Design a protein with these regions (language model features):
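A broad, structure-centric signal for solvent-exposed, well-ordered loop/edge residues
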Residues: 18, 33, 56, 83, ...
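Enriched for short, Lys/Arg-rich terminal
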Residues: 2, 74-104
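General N-terminal targeting signals
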Residues: 26-28, 39, 43, 66, ...
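Arg/Lys-rich, positively charged N-terminal/basic patches that mediate binding to nucleic acids
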Residues: 1-45
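A short, surface-exposed loop/turn module that caps and links secondary-structure elements
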Residues: 47-76
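Residue-level signal for well-ordered alpha-helical positions
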Residues: 22, 52, 97-98
């Protein structure tokens, strides 16, 4: 049995900016804790890519391929969000996060 490969997850500035905007928007509607709780849930799922990234295949979405030629996609939070990432050596680089309805 081979050992499971693990990666270091790197989140791009674009994703961090999108998550911050998401937290602020949710906080403006509900409470500040709600925005941070939702973003922390997303960050937890992104962190799981450290051991699950190999389970995904290259994306068939043109939008994902335009971000990186070897892009892979993952849907999270009840399929509401699509994460575009790629593997580079020992790293999983999270490139973007989109509402799932907008990716094509």
């Amino acid at each position: 049995m081979t050992a499971m490969r693990t990666y270091q997850v790197i989140i791009s500035y674009a994703v961090l900016s999108e998550l911050e905007a998401m937290a602020q928007y949710i906080a403006s509607i509900y409470r500040p804790e709600s925005g941070h709780k939702y973003v922390n849930r997303i960050l937890g799922q992104l962190a799981a890519l450290s051991y699950s990234a190999d389970a995904y295949q290259y994306s068939r979405f043109k939008m994902a391929k335009s971000i990186h030629p070897k892009a892979e996609t993952l849907t999270i939070i009840n399929r509401k969000w699509t994460v575009v990432f790629h593997i580079d050596g020992d790293f999983v680089i999270v490139d973007r996060i989109f509402p799932s309805k907008t990716i094509f």
